[in-house]
Amino acid sequence: MTAAAPSQQRPAAARARNLPWVEKYRPQTLADLISHQDILSTIQKFISEDRLPHLLLYGPPGTGKTSTILACAKQLYKDKEFGSMVLELNASDDRGIDIVRGPILSFASTRTIFKKGFKLVILDEADAMTQDAQNALRRVIEKFTENTRFCLICNYLSKIIPALQSRCTRFRFGPLTPELMVPRLEHVVQEENVDISEDGMKALVTLSSGDMRRALNILQSTNMAFGKVTEETVYTCTGHPLKTDIANILDWMLNQDFTTAYKNIMELKTLKGLALHDILTEVHLFVHRVDFPSSVRIHLLTKMADIEYRLSVGTSEKIQLSSLIAAFQVTRDLIVAEA
């Protein structure tokens, strides 16, 4: 028995080592979660008083919605009963009414013999469900409230029908602040012995925009690809344009003739694999920072909005890049005319 123990431990250690960091460092208890303390304290009170209602957790990706309800489930149920008491589904896998009539209905309608209390159905990405499926789910929730609690998780509250919203207690999870993200990222960096610079950490936080899942994925990918996490390697790994690239692009659009600007930007896009949508996002931030005359800023933002829309419906990047350069060159002429 003692000789076999190390060989039994090795597969478990290997599994932990091969796990994505998002799962490896997922909070296991409510106390491990780093934000939304007001929401967590309310849910903790529901659990301690055995009055957990149906829940609707909504907000941007990577803000702790799924981690929160999984931590609740682990507090409510022991490991051996978890599988029989908790049903976790991703509604985007099967968005139709069959998922409600099939696994959800059969799980909610059966009672457990040896365990008192309610079962828990966790429905992730519930905003992907069709309206018919949501209406069917409403009837299931009404019928089996006595022995089952439902937790719906979504990014967009507006895509959940009012009848479902009214049957749940709603909690909004906002994006995480840098002050909350940095200590948790530093913990992962220390545990994984990651070589990271200060500007690399800032780039991680900036690009993730309050999404902890995205921050951890970028951190792991950059570390594996380059062995060192700096601002440049983070931007290169994600295919996002560097600040110096944006500065060059803006300089070309405002100061060079059309042909030269187009040639230089196309060469840079090809060399670094940049997407025009990412360039447009960074240039948009620049427009708000610079003190343009109001009429000039309005003209430029309107043109950029049109370009973004046309990109979203699948038009040619080359044509839209031409349109972006033209918009900036017209802007340059307007500034000169108003001077």
UniProtKB/Swiss-Prot annotation:
UniProt-listed CDD domains: AAA, HLD_clamp_RFC
Q: Which domain of life is it from?
A: Eukaryota
* Cell compartments where the protein resides: Nucleus
**GO BP terms, alphabetized:** DNA-templated DNA replication; positive regulation of DNA-directed DNA polymerase activity
Its biological purpose is as follows: Subunit of the replication factor C (RFC) complex which acts during elongation of primed DNA templates by DNA polymerases delta and epsilon, and is necessary for ATP-dependent loading of proliferating cell nuclear antigen (PCNA) onto primed DNA.
According to the record's subunit comment, the protein's assembly and interactions are: Subunit of the RFC complex, an heteropentameric complex consisting of a large subunit RFC1 and four small subunits RFC2, RFC3, RFC4 and RFC5; the RFC complex interacts with PCNA. Forms an heterotetrameric complex with RFC2, RFC3 and RFC4; this complex has ATPase activity but is not stimulated by PCNA. The heterotetramer of subunits RFC2, RFC3, RFC4 and RFC5 interacts with RAD17.
**What does the sequence similarity comment in the record state about its family?**
Belongs to the activator 1 small subunits family.
Recorded protein name is: Replication factor C subunit 5
Native species of this protein? Answer: Mus musculus (Mouse)
Per UniProt, what is the name of the gene that codes for the protein in this document? Answer: Rfc5
